Amino acid sequence: LFKAGIDAFAFNNVGNPFKESPIPYNTHDFERETIREFGKLFAFPSDDTWGFLSHSGTDSNMHGMYMGRTILRGRAGLLPKAYFTREAHYSVQILRDLLGLEGVMVETLPDGGMDPDDLTHKLAENANVPALVVATVGTTFKGAIDNVDHIREKLRGHASYLHVDAALFGGYLPFTPYAVEMSYQTSDATLSGRYDSIAVSCHKFFGFPSPAGLFITRQSLYEEFNAHFSQIHNPEYIHHVPGTITCSRDSVKPAEFYFFTTPSALARQAEDAQLILKNATYLLDQMHTHFPQLSAMRANPLSNTIYFRNPGDAIVDKYSLATMHLDVDNKPEGFAHVVVMPHVTRDVLTEFLTDLENR
């Protein structure tokens, strides 16, 4: 890449990567191919896919929520309300405030996933207001999954936009028997798709060395959004309305992340995806057998996250474990979690289990 001038002097991916750029030094070609290849993984229509490489998963969530807000306001003439759960990533709460939207907190099921029945109840309470729903596939602490199909069914007949935050799980589920959880396609002929847009982090499952994110939606939905977006601004000097909130964008990351669409990288990702789920199962079994007092849990078989009672500062500090308090019998109890990533080998897990034994 350096020999081609990328990262040698100022490149800029400003604008829509699917439009010709007035700035000759960009990597839009890499960016387009990356979006198309990941669009295939998520089963978007090949002739109706749009997206770009963002600065982070939060940046991708911002574009999804802003697109939803803009489209729904354009259709209904009033701002939507944002629906999400307390298990959603904290960026969703920040973005709700940033976008000036009223939030509707939906209750969760015991596993941490969104409660579809409570969503129905909350939608009925706001029947005349569009709904911008953020579903999480892989919640940050528990690894829970909001059932996208159930949510979409509950939204039937209600003006809505469904954005999926799949920051971690979106990276590996397409390579597992659970790939349908990430698929845009639906067997329901009355629906255009299972969701409207999706955010996936590049620096989580893929191990990309710096924060970046994928944002993918339908080209037709993007065009509806951009028709409203162009009324807000129209920067003539870049020859088109960019369609992104961020203006100047990194050119190095799309060129580097393109590697993850190559056959060898995809094969490695498939191996890694199988491995992390296998090792997560192993860790859970070992903790149930040897440390039942830690109450280790796994939200579902799709998750590579195991959470358990806080084992103490020494373990937490050595392994940089995230911690938080969860309600247990209506009392806050300290918990920690392990996220089993590709670098977490059996040797690492054995050392971790030994440290638990010796604490």
Model features per residue range: what roles?
Residues 14-22, 46-52, 78, 103-108, ...:
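Glycine- and acidic
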Residues 18-30, 56, 84-88, 111-114, ...:
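Catalytic cores of large soluble enzymes that bind and process phosphate-bearing ligands
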Residues 56-226:
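Conserved PLP-enzyme active-site core in the AAT-like
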Residues 78, 222, 227-247, 261, ...:
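Conserved C-terminal alpha-helix-loop-beta "cap" of PLP-dependent enzymes
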Residues 32-39, 43, 66-69, 97, ...:
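Amphipathic, well-packed alpha-helical segments that form the structural scaffold of globular domains
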Residues 208, 243-259:
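PLP-dependent aminotransferase class I/II
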Residues 39-49, 74-76, 287-297:
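Surface-exposed helix-capping loop/turn segments at secondary-structure junctions
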Residues 1-48, 335-336:
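N-terminal entrance/gating region of PLP-dependent enzymes' catalytic architecture
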